[in-house]
Amino acid sequence: VDFDSESPRRPEIQ
């Protein structure tokens, strides 16, 4: 369910 381990619920928005 998690896109990024560092983000709670966000895709890679860098």
From Swiss-Prot:
Post-translational modification: Contains 8 disulfide bonds.
Keyword RNA-binding applies: no
Keyword Secreted: yes
Primary subcellular site in the record, as a coarse category: secreted
Domain of life: Eukaryota
Any Gene Ontology CC annotation: extracellular region
Family named by the database record: Belongs to the CRISP family.
Keywords on record: Disulfide bond, Secreted
Extra remark: Negative results: does not show any toxic, hemorrhagic or edematogenic activities in mice. Does not degrade fibrinogen or azocasein. Does not induce platelet aggregation, or inhibit collagen, ADP thrombin or ristocetin-induced platelet aggregation. It is not yet known if this protein blocks ion channels.
Localization, UniProt: Secreted
Record protein name field: Cysteine-rich venom protein
Tissue localization of expression: Expressed by the venom gland.
